[in-house]
Amino acid sequence: MAKSKKDSGARRKKVTRTVADGIAHVHASFNNTIITITDRQGNALSWATSGGAGFRGSRKSTPFAAQVAAENAGNAAKDYGLKNLEVRVKGPGPGRESSIRALNGCGYKITHIEDVTPIPHNGCRPPKKRRV
């Protein structure tokens, strides 16, 4: 006979830390947009993607999908008391501009916008051009 697990009753309350300003990392590829909001040390507070927001296939790579993902990540990070955001954008995708606008619309003060797209000094051979 299985014993029932006894509930101790005293549960530890989860401590939420307050972070004044953080960094929003926007990774905008051609297929998807990933937004991660971190503190100054790089510890992730919240994240969201276009695919995780319910968009599938070619709709994942639209500016509207990036906007919805940025709103989801921004609203999830509000629990930490975030006020100021520094935005670092990486990649050539269509969600670059709209995700910044959506984070601004969430009520954050954007202090700095930086493009951190990696540029090769003639590194790997790029993929071949599409023939449609």
From Swiss-Prot:
Signal peptide: none annotated. The keyword Cell membrane does not apply. It holds the Pfam family Ribosomal_S11. The keyword Ribosomal protein applies. GO terms for biological process: translation. Disulfide bonds: none annotated. GO terms for cellular component: ribonucleoprotein complex; ribosome. GO terms for molecular function: rRNA binding; structural constituent of ribosome. PROSITE patterns: RIBOSOMAL_S11. Keywords: Ribonucleoprotein, Ribosomal protein, RNA-binding, rRNA-binding. InterPro entries: Ribosomal_uS11, Ribosomal_uS11_bac-type, Ribosomal_uS11_CS, Ribosomal_uS11_sf. PANTHER family: 40S RIBOSOMAL PROTEIN S14/30S RIBOSOMAL PROTEIN S11 (PTHR11759). NCBIfam families: PRK05309.1, uS11_bact. Part of the 30S ribosomal subunit. Interacts with proteins S7 and S18. Binds to IF-3. Belongs to the universal ribosomal protein uS11 family. Located on the platform of the 30S subunit, it bridges several disparate RNA helices of the 16S rRNA. Forms part of the Shine-Dalgarno cleft in the 70S ribosome. This is Small ribosomal subunit protein uS11. It comes from Alcanivorax borkumensis (strain ATCC 700651 / DSM 11573 / NCIMB 13689 / SK2).
